[in-house]
Amino acid sequence: MTALTLSTAAAPGLRADAIVIGVAKGAGGPSVAPGAEAVDKAYDGRLAAVLETLGASGAEGEVTKLPAPSGFKAPVVVAVGLGAEPEKDAGFDPEALRRAAGAAARALAGAKKAAFALPLAEAADAGVVAEGLLLGAYSFDAYKASAKEAKEAKGAKAKANGNGKAPLAEAALLGGKPRDKAYKAAIERATAVAEELNRARDLVNTPPNDLDPEAFAAVAQAAAKEHGIKVQVLDEKALVKGGYGGILGVGAGSASGPRLVKLSYTSPKAKKSLAFVGKGITYDSGGISLKPAGHNETMKCDMAGAAAVFAAVVAAARLGLEVNVTGWLALAENMPSGSATRPGDVLRMYSGKTVEVLNTDAEGRLVLADALWAASQDEPDAIIDVATLTGAMMLALGSRTYGIMANDDAFRSAVHEAAEESGEPAWPMPLPEHLRKGMDSPTADIANMGERMGGGLVAGLFLREFVGEGITWAHLDIAGPAFNEGGPFGYTPKGGTGTAVRTLVRVAELAAAGELG
């Protein structure tokens, strides 16, 4: 991962491959953002005019490269768009800074060192810039020959990106205060969160032949040991003994057995406890209700919820948050075979309720149901589950926004605010009571399907049935933004995105501070 430093050095004398500056979109054309004064001065105050001549407007995500002025030790200036120029005395939007830093980091793949002269009015700005560039520098090429060649050429720690270039090796943030505790803390937080989010991306991007439930559980065990997190793994025998019918039913058709992983981070100063529950379908074929052909290769991402939960728990431990956080990873592979669960089968869940399976491709809610009930037994102050659950949510909110449902409006609002503060687009969704009747079953206590319209909300209502009485709960349906099938943008790569990690970490921080809901 890119090495970060805070520097008080002046841009002209800094040895680097490039100087990154910000450009805002003003009413009369592009304007040079604070932090780039030395660069602008070297252009005799005409940098904005030069950029406009080159076609730059300051639009968000725009990247323009130009030769550095005479006397600069860095040969190139990289101007990144920050979007609309803020009003007088107002700072730049944190997400605009985050995305600009990410876009610059992507543009600088292959560079050894870059200096970022972006607006750092306060420590929080340093944190979001650091987070953006660390996330933007991410790449996943472990399975490419070009990656192996680049690794051998640049050393064991190098990791190539798609064009054979290693990610930006080092970044110096100019204008920060290296000795200021607030700045140091902001950088440390950004580093921990970004590293764990990138770990979640790695898991989502890993081919399913290398990441089955057992392999995922092993990754969690190794990380738990490294960071002092207690871990418990229930294998098939333990799941049978415990009566986890939902997880077992989903995994019944696969040669790779299911797992339920419990990660427990505890703080001696904690006054609150949270449980995060993640859907971890390491590959989703749909089971007997087989998915149609087309884009099935992306179904490796159906464990993105579990990856987000795993990353968030580890990040909480690394940050030493004063809150107890338990992560539940419900891991299974949904495959068709002679032993697979059939439409019409009835499963007895861990809670004791029975579920009639009308569609085996509505499997995520089955593994989550068992994990939610297991999490409820610890009586946490709140539970949040994360899942790539329904295509209906994608139709409702698109590919970049996830939906939030909850059994408490105030808690739903608090989670939504945490998502916004983290830079993760989300939207509150209802749980209409009239939709519950559609899941009535003549055979079992409830069916795993209901009305076709409002399918994302129906799924939320199903999950609510398995949350312990009196426990505050929220459900994040991340089906849209969990996997980016388009081109990279800002700090978001193609493939796994790590959606919801930052929201969960922010929720944990708020709980630790006694400010959640």
Swiss-Prot record:
**A Gene Ontology cellular-component term:** cytoplasm
Cofactor details (free text): Binds 2 manganese ions per subunit.
The residues listed in the UniProt record as binding Mn(2+) 2, with positions renumbered to this chain, are 279, 284, 302, 363
Q: Which cofactor does it need?
A: Mn(2+)
Matches recorded under Gene3D superfamilies: Leucine Aminopeptidase, subunit E, domain 1, Zn peptidases
The UniProt GO MF terms for this protein read: manganese ion binding; metalloaminopeptidase activity; peptidase activity
Which residues are involved in binding Mn(2+) 1?
284, 361, 363
Q: What is its EC number?
A: 3.4.11.1, 3.4.11.10
Q: InterPro entries, from UniProt?
A: Leucine_aapep/pepB, Macro_dom-like, Peptidase_M17_C, Peptidase_M17_leu_NH2_pept, Peptidase_M17_N
Q: Does the keyword Hydrolase apply?
A: yes
Q: Which reaction does it catalyse?
A: Release of an N-terminal amino acid, Xaa-|-Yaa-, in which Xaa is preferably Leu, but may be other amino acids including Pro although not Arg or Lys, and Yaa may be Pro. Amino acid amides and methyl esters are also readily hydrolyzed, but rates on arylamides are exceedingly low; Release of an N-terminal amino acid, preferentially leucine, but not glutamic or aspartic acids
Any single GO BP term: proteolysis
What are the UniProt keywords, alphabetically?
Aminopeptidase, Cytoplasm, Hydrolase, Manganese, Metal-binding, Protease
- Residues of the active site are 291, 365
Instruction: Name the protein family.
Output: Belongs to the peptidase M17 family.
The name under which this protein is listed is Probable cytosol aminopeptidase
Organism in which the protein naturally occurs: Streptomyces coelicolor (strain ATCC BAA-471 / A3(2) / M145)
